[in-house]
Amino acid sequence: MVWFCNSADCQFSVFALTTIGWILSSTSTGLVEWRIWYMKDTSLYPPGIACVGIFRVCIYRRRTNSTTTKFCYRYSYQDTFLPFEISMAQRFLLTASIFGFFGRAFNMFALRNMSMRMFEEDTYNSFVVSGILNIAAGVFNLIAVLQNYDAVINSQGITFLPSLQMPFKPDVQEVGTAIQVAGIGVLPMLLTGMFSLFYKCPPYGQVHPGISEM
């Protein structure tokens, strides 16, 4: 097929896009702005804004007109209040980050061989393994993004610890920037994974014995 990315320049571009996608996806894992909660003042809970992340939640509350306090709580594996989409995203995003790291490692090895014009089976296999790992990383990221996006759209609640003084559901819930960053990182991971997976050794890379003239 004509869209196979077999040239060195094309594969180096693929590697650059893969790196961008991996960085965006890995960065989103540490961001806290996955779900934004806006909470009004009630008799049970004080007003404030909460950023619900995959590994922690940060709560911002205005004490005076010029003072805002911030409190962050990092989830532990003993926390049973975490909903399915967050528990799943914790595992999926970490797995995707590891897969993406090793996918880049195999891609670098294949590019090294290509730059040295070593078009052998090891080069082909490295591109294929890199493609599989990058696609798997992209799929894991995509599932985590879609699950948490769906939770925001459907206004799903979370039963936080009483000490956090947060309601089960906020008055307003919005999609945070972390979901957008993770979503942007999915596309290059999937596309570059496809290009690497279907890499074909160019005909000129095949080694033929030379014929000496008498």
UniProtKB/Swiss-Prot annotation:
Ribonucleoprotein as UniProt keyword: no
Membrane spanning residue stretches: 12-32, 81-101, 126-146, 178-198
Subcellular localization, as worded in the UniProt entry: Cell junction, Tight junction; Cell membrane
Keyword Zinc found: no
Residue ranges that the UniProt entry lists as topological domain Extracellular: 33-80, 147-177
Membrane topology field: Multi-pass membrane protein
GO molecular function terms listed in the Swiss-Prot or TrEMBL record: structural molecule activity
Protein's GO biological process: bicellular tight junction assembly; cell adhesion
Alphabetical list of InterPro entries matching this protein: Claudin
Protein family (similarity comment): Belongs to the claudin family.
Name of the protein this chain belongs to: Claudin-34
Organism: Homo sapiens (Human)
Top-level taxonomy: Eukaryota, Metazoa, Chordata, Craniata, Vertebrata
Gene: CLDN34
